[in-house]
From Swiss-Prot:
SUPFAM superfamilies: MFS general substrate transporter. This is Dityrosine transporter 1. Its main location: membrane. Induction: During sporulation. Residues 1-110, 171-184, 229-240, 289-366, 420-446, 494-520, 564-572 are cytoplasmic. Phosphorylated. Residues 132-149, 206-207, 262-267, 388-398, 470-472, 542 are extracellular. Prospore-specific dityrosine transporter responsible for translocation of dityrosine through the prospore membrane and required for the formation of the outermost layer of the spore. The lineage of its organism: Eukaryota, Fungi, Dikarya, Ascomycota, Saccharomycotina.
Length: 572
């Protein structure tokens, strides 16, 4: 049996329709289908087919079939459409039976999300658990405060550049293998940090490798979310994933305080991160499947069947919602695409290998650079607040270390609320737009409308925080403005990340890596110079200037909302 009958019967590749007396073949790739046509009922499909004079899956178009042949053909057509109805997309009355976006069951997606959220927590935790121990490490290593603080600057610098490397490979070579490589490197480095003798040069080198290994988590995680979650739910999916990275700066100082409160146990900071990293590596190796779409498609194991085996199956993919016979330790090692058929490659194309040229093209792309710089400015304002908050609480408000740590809970909770509410509202507005504009492709830039609100909240919080400290307002006022700054920043970060992954789905990890690069560079510069600027300008005017800088983000987002459609969102 050849491949053509298999494609016509089971996959619905060729759909012939009568149009102006001619027969045409219509093909829609998976990435081109709109969400307004998903989950259409069987009655609606039958009604559309009744009103259209076309012959689906017609084996002999020139013949005049008998009545019995027509009945058999109709029955075969109904079986083909029903088998894909619950999970398919129907972009036009001419087309039926399309591939579901993902084959992974709900339970398996919960496992995937649990793992990537936990891994996402490890990266920021590795950087932030170290900061409360800086005075202690300064004494242990017998160096100046400037030298020991430089280990933080080096970490942030490498943490900014690292995602460019991981993001480039993640969109080409697979997610799971890179997770295993980065976690293995992180585990080795953390063990060495906990065990090597005191030597400042060794500390610098190991912190560089620690930052490089831990910098993979956000770009790989965002890519994984794009693999398994369709665009209509991606806003809240990104919000759930970002719970991990957002919790890192909140929990890490608390853990560090608990470890250090009983004495000189700073090595256990790295011991704790080693244990957490080891657990993550085991989870990834044992439970996480490969999800990169150009390798495994939508996750259906039948893509890997031989052609003759697939042809003998009544339904080539997606029979129900469960995945049977899933095994432990799946997809270990470097993976090749499970299928080389033209149909698979058309729907799940492999992007070209990444390099410096690719990133240069991304940086020159207005939607990417504007969104990345906008997020970086907001992130810089937040880090300026984060660095100065503890300093002024200790010197101006006479807070203890325990009280300072508790004060950070307020902006931390605001970060989580901003990410979650922004993600859910983004998806809700997207679904409303699709319902009011049937049969039209959703403009991804529509999500950025929410950024206007988040930017204004961040500007108000930033300026208000500076003047509240300048006039020595009550501590509760500081908490309110800090919450506004944190809420607005994560609100915008979530929406921007969702926008980039929807605009460039095949380069999700790469575009998020570029955005992370600008964001972390901004945070590193801001945290390094903010105290000097506050001393020179006064904290009120300094944070007013930061708020005005954030207004540049407002201009950039407005530009994209107005002129986005003049740019063609081509995959790189």
């Amino acid at each position: 049996m050849g491949s053509e009958p298999f494609q016509k019967k089971n996959l619905g590749l060729q759909i012939n329709s009568q149009e102006s007396g001619t027969t045409r073949s219509t093909f829609h790739s998976l990435e081109d289908l709109g969400d307004d046509v998903i989950n259409e009922s069987w009655d609606q499909v039958n009604q559309k087919r009744a009103n259209i004079d076309h012959d689906v899956f017609h084996e002999h178009p020139d013949s005049s079939p008998s009545l019995s042949a027509q009945k058999a053909k109709t029955k075969e057509e109904e079986v083909a459409v029903k088998s894909s109805n619950s999970q398919s997309r129907d972009p036009s009355p001419d087309t039926q039976a399309h591939i579901p976006y993902t084959y992974f069951s709900k339970d398996q997606r919960l496992i995937i999300f649990g793992i990537i959220i936990f891994i996402g927590f490890l990266g920021p935790m590795s950087g932030n658990i170290y900061i409360p121990a800086l005075p202690l490490l300064q004494r242990e290593y017998d160096v100046s405060a400037t030298t020991i603080n430089a280990t933080v600057s080096v970490f942030m610098a490498v943490f900014s550049v690292g995602p460019l490397f991981w993001g480039a490979l993640a969109d080409f070579g697979g997610r799971k293998f890179l997770y295993m490589v980065s976690l293995s490197l992180m585990l080795i480095v953390n063990i060495l940090l906990a065990a090597v003798p005191v030597n400042i040069a060794a500390l610098f080198v190991l912190r560089i490798f620690q930052a490089f290994a831990s910098s993979s988590v956000i770009s790989l995680g965002a890519g994984t979310v794009t693999d398994v979650v369709p665009p209509k739910h991606r806003g809240k999916a990104i919000a759930y994933f970002m719970m991990g990275p957002n919790m890192g700066p909140i929990i890490a100082p608390i853990v560090a305080g608990l470890i250090l409160m009983k004495g000189n146990y700073w090595r256990w900071l790295f011991g704790f991160t080693s244990i957490m990293t080891g657990i993550a590596l085991i989870l990834v190796t044992a439970l996480l499947p490969e999800t990169l779409r150009c390798i495994v498609g939508n996750g259906d194991p039948k893509w890997g069947d031989k052609k003759d085996e697939r042809e003998n199956n009544e339904s080539p993919f997606f029979e129900g919602n469960k995945i049977s016979h899933r095994r432990l330790f799946p997809d270990i090692g470097i993976r090749k695409p499970v299928n080389n058929d033209a149909f698979f490659q058309e729907n799940f194309p492999k992007p070209p290998k990444a390099g410096l040229t690719l990133y240069w093209k991304m940086i020159k792309c207005p939607p990417i650079i504007i969104t990345s710089v906008s997020t970086a400015l907001l992130f810089s304002s937040y880090y300026a607040f984060s660095v100065t908050f503890s300093y002024y609480l200790e010197h101006d408000y006479r807070f203890t270390m325990l009280e300072i740590g508790a004060a950070y809970v307020c902006p931390g909770v605001a970060m989580l609320l901003g990410s979650q509410s922004g993600g859910h509202l983004s998806d809700y507005l997207r679904s409303r737009w699709i319902k009011s504009h049937p049969k039209k492709k959703f403009p991804a830039e529509f999500r950025l409308l929410l950024n206007l609100i988040g930017i204004l909240l961040t500007i108000c919080g930033t300026i208000g925080y500076g003047w509240a400290i300048f006039f020595h307002y009550h501590f509760v006022v500081l908490l309110v403005f800090s919450a506004l700054t944190a809420f607005g920043m994560t609100w915008c970060s979530n929406t921007s990340m969702t926008y980039l992954t929807e605009l460039f789905p095949k380069r999700a990890a790469g575009t998020v890596a570029v955005s992370s690069f600008f964001r972390n560079v901004g945070a590193a510069i801001s945290s390094a110079i903010i105290l000097q600027l506050c001393n020179a300008m006064g904290i009120g005017w300094c944070f007013t200037g930061l708020g005005l800088c954030s207004s540049i983000s407002l201009i950039g987002i407005l530009y994209l909302l107005i002129f986005q459609r003049k740019y063609t969102a081509k995959e790189f």
